[in-house]
Amino acid sequence: MESKRMEEPYFTFGIIADIQYADMDNRFNYLKTSMRYYRNSLTQLKAAVEEWAMESIKPAFILQLGDIIDGINTKDKSSKTALERVLVEMDKLPIQFHHVWGNHEFYNFSREYLNGSKLNSQARGDRIDRGGGTSENGEFNDESFYAYHFSPCPKFRFLLIDGYDLSPIGREKTSPKYDIALNLLKEKNPNEDLNSPTGLEEVQFVLFNGGISPSQLDWMERVLTSSDEKEENVFVVSHLPVHPDAADPMCLVWNYPEVLSVLQSHPCVVGYLAGHNHEGRYCMDPYGIHHLTFSGVIETPPESRAFGTMYVYEDKMVLKGRGLVEDRTLYYRDPKNKAERH
């Protein structure tokens, strides 16, 4: 009986990415390389919700990794209707969702709208040293970034970061960060179509990606330093991947080397979870951090699935994937590696 208890996880959580729902017929993606199943993405979400509800160990929460509805909804002004349809399905599960924001959130809505919507799950995070999307008097602050952290269990923490902190699509034109982002993008990408990586040495500098500002990097440093001191295991979560071996290089955070440097310098970091690259990829970097990019629901054929449940143990996390998401056993960083600073 004791051994059985020892095998039980500390907690579990669900993961789903790039639902990109729209009430539209199937069509090819931007690059014409794969089919997008717009209506079926809602069916895929329903299947995930039903399975999570039936699991013997109920997930403590669900990570929704961004791009919850597709930007195509703006063509017939159906963004709010599409979002409501998705949220209705999510609300059928009596479990909290933690949302990150991707490029399609910003195709459909302003940052201010998102801040006041159900896609702002900051209130579910710790109130100490949070990234914040509001000023001290409670008013919306467009210069802030959407990021927070929470601890579902002692010795474990999740840090959600804003990959579109520096981005022309993630900021209003009146924002100083908009000008900084646009100037940087045009400096790196001379193409007329800023979504095109043609001829670029740094192919991540396209409009559908974004960057992490110095202020957010400083905030991440503070949170991770605190977690180092507490000897916590930290999962960092974002829409955009940060490791070239865990995604198509065209899908990375603009300043991914800076972000990686921060993550790899903190022994508390055990994993980085992302979406955006719909085919999904995985790697473990030289510091023992697991970089897991989840397959996108939107490009998952109707006969398959694309979601997973992570089981968290003292020394490892075990992913039970469905369909395109593979099962994986991911051990935490070796104590010797943890002691080495970047």
From Swiss-Prot:
Q: Which UniProt keywords apply?
A: Hydrolase, Metal-binding, Zinc
Highest taxon in the source lineage: Eukaryota
| Annotated binding of Zn(2+) 1, by residue | 18, 20, 67, 278
Question: Tell me, what does this protein do in biology?
Answer: Hydrolyzes ADP-ribose, IDP-ribose, CDP-glycerol, CDP-choline and CDP-ethanolamine, but not other non-reducing ADP-sugars or CDP-glucose.
Name the family the entry cites. Answer: Belongs to the ADPRibase-Mn family.
Q: How does it assemble?
A: Monomer.
Its recorded name reads Manganese-dependent ADP-ribose/CDP-alcohol diphosphatase
For this protein's source organism, the top of the classification is: Eukaryota, Metazoa, Chordata, Craniata, Vertebrata
